[in-house]
Amino acid sequence: MLRVVVGGVFVAHGLQKLRGYWDGPGLEGTEKMMESLEMHPAPLQARAVALAETVGGGALALGIATPYAAAALIATMVTAVRKVHLNNGFFNSKRGYEYNAVLATAVLAVVADGPGVISVDAVGGNHRAGIGSALFALVAGIAGSFFATGVASSLKPTAPAEDA
């Protein structure tokens, strides 16, 4: 049940960013947000986060490639904490990282416990679970976050050179 609920939350947030559903910003607004966070190129970063949340959330909800879906979702949460929420403290009421931490922890709990018997992974005989799978998702997610922000800083647009 946790897998379906948490995956559904990510799908909803991804669709807000991707399509503008439920008063979300859509891709244009997400691109502007990425630009303001100096996540370059903003169009690529916007699509990456929107798809990671939508596809990763759907995969988590269905129990498809669960540790890999979890890694993508953890990457989005780690990046959100690092780029937006960390300096605001813990509580969500002050735009802190509370919500992101809860979602990332729930994702890790799903991976540690396994996708469950009613999942695509279980039907396919790929029922990975345990601390090793959770550790993989956590490390891969953190690495993904640092990769995305490293790419963002290396691809920062520069002003065109002026003619002398």
Residue ranges and their predicted role:
Residues M1-K17, T66-A164:
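Extended, low-polarity transmembrane helix blocks
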Residues K32, V49, G63, L73-T76:
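Internal, well-ordered alpha-helical scaffold/interface segments
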Residues P43, G56-G57, L103-T105:
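Short hydrophobic "helix-edge" motifs at membrane interfaces and signal-peptide entry regions
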Residues L51-L60, V84-H85:
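Hydrophobic, membrane-inserted alpha-helices
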Residues L37-L44, I64, F90, K94:
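Juxtamembrane loop-transmembrane helix junctions in multi-pass integral membrane proteins
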